[in-house]
Amino acid sequence: CPTAVFEFLTYIIAIFPFISGYLYPKDGVSVKKIIKKRSNLILSYYFLGFINYLFWVFAAQESFKNVGTGECLKNFILVRTDLFSAVPINIIPLWYLFFLFVVELLYTVLRNRRLLAVGIAFGIFLRVYSSIHHVAMPFKIDVAFTSLITLEFGRLFKERVHSKLRLWQAITALGIWLSIAWINGGSNWNTGDYGKFGILSLVGEFAAIIFIVWVAQVVEKNNPKIVWSQIASVLRRFSEDSIFVLGYHITVGGIIIGILSMVGMVVTEETLRAYWYITFPSMLVPMYLLILLLPKPLKLALSQPYQFYQLVSSKRRQN
């Protein structure tokens, strides 16, 4: 993907913790409840990661192995997915599962102890400091701190914004988003790299959120006119099986690379980057076919073991 477009799109990631904050219970929630509700994300991270790790060890091409298997296993366990050359490439996207659990837990702990402002201030400091010296903590703790403010923004937005966003607000937000992406570069949460000027990334992310919320409001209002039923169906499918897709889309791409290699084609990381417009659909289409054809129990068994256990248990009780 062209660098400028990629850097612009990186700011979209902020919408997800914003949604978590938007959906956060108005009266708060206990730490125990958060752990019980969201610990399945950690289980899915390690479960999917271990499957992908085994695939990388036994099936990946040697050109994609830049470091020993033991070092990669350690980085996988510590969620050091920022170390691109020292962790299996098919594990990297899974960092978000672990991060989402950590940020919601951290937010709840700090909010319940009335220390949220301190945590947000520390997160802003990390963003600014990252422009001077790279910061990367195990288990995505640093990313959780830097995104606390985004989660709180989502909660406050729901609480205080009761009218629809206007067109001029959306255009202004888009302009700010574009400008900051051009000035600051991309914002990569996985690596803890927030661009040339860390504080600008926060402004760019807020602008991206406002624009995306406006788009969502327009789509909701004009649903029959804008969203074709076929497009809505595809998006719904990907949404329902998002963890399965997140966990296996690179592995599916790896299988395709293996097939191409068997017929004499040479595929490298440079090739994948240069021909992104071919790489992306070649992973997207097979993944869509998989989520269409595979039964739900199998998809859960391959990606969300706890949900699979609950499904099996409920069927046993019914019988």
Which residues make up each language-model segment?
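Alpha-helical transmembrane segments and their immediate juxtamembrane cytosolic regions
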Residues: 1-319
